[in-house]
Amino acid sequence: LDFIPRLLAAVPPASALLRIYEDRYRRSHGCDLNYRNLWWTPPLGPKEALALERGQIEALGLQPLVSITDHDNIEAPLLLRVLNESRDAPLSVEWTVPWRDTYFHLGIHNLPGRQAGARMSALARFTEEPREAELCGLLDWLGEDRETLVVFNHPYWNEKGTGQALQNALAEEFLSIYRTWIHALELNGLRSWRENRRVMDLAARAGLPAVSGGDRHGCEPNALINLTRSRSFSEFVAEIRFAGRSAVLVMPQYRESMSSRVLGAIVDVVRDHDGHMHGWTKWSDRVFYRCSADGEAVPLSRIFEPGREPSLIRLFVAAARLMELRGVKAAIRHVLQPAQELSL
């Protein structure tokens, strides 16, 4: 959650309150609060997320092929493969690739089952200790399996906050160097149409297809989906990787105000959800903090009793839940930017 101080910097009262908590933490622990050791997980477990995505596609009268990814681990697809209804779930991951002054995310879809563990170990080592000279060999190894798909996810998203111009330049340089091992670029359902349009232009210049992707962290199904005649995910990989064909369908929710949709995702995060696959029904069950680099990741529900969280957290949760009210939702839609106009 290292975006929190950057986000609150634009809100002076909240920023001042945050500094008070940071000073208190520093006095108590003798070190600064490391926001990289604080993170949240989506409100839906793998089973629920898969059902959500499948349901949207089936409502169109289509047969769903869904690849569920998480950052830097394949626990979700491994769990799905235990269930009868999702035994064919592809083993996929969103891999964090530190590169020069930024980091990128590559979607690695449909890893070979027998080699998935070895590949994930190698990816984790690179993320922990990146060596640029090793990246070509690692990507080449991933691509040895012809049923694996490598997607450059949201290349223009300035997640690290290094500056948009630098992010754009590094993304284009990264693609020019590793183009041989990248099979497609992602159009992301939670990024603006302006940004996705730039990604389409970049893909066209590189001679690569653009495919749909998500970053669905709430309860809204993906706003962009691929249409295909493939009957299996391996066939879909071949269609993208070797035939270079991709048809992306824009769902109605993508036309809504992006700010409104992001706020909706935040509301989903701080809402309690019964029936979570891991039993994480409270929002505080799904927010974790690691006190040290080698320490245990502990949910906030174990650190604070319900209702005894720091006032800044309680105020944030209360404000987010206020946005669930129908009148507040309507007001937000009126105040925020209008729906996106889509044009090629």
Located regions from the model:
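Charged catalytic cores and adjacent phosphate/nucleic-acid-binding surfaces used
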Residues: 1-23, 78, 83-87, 99-116, ...
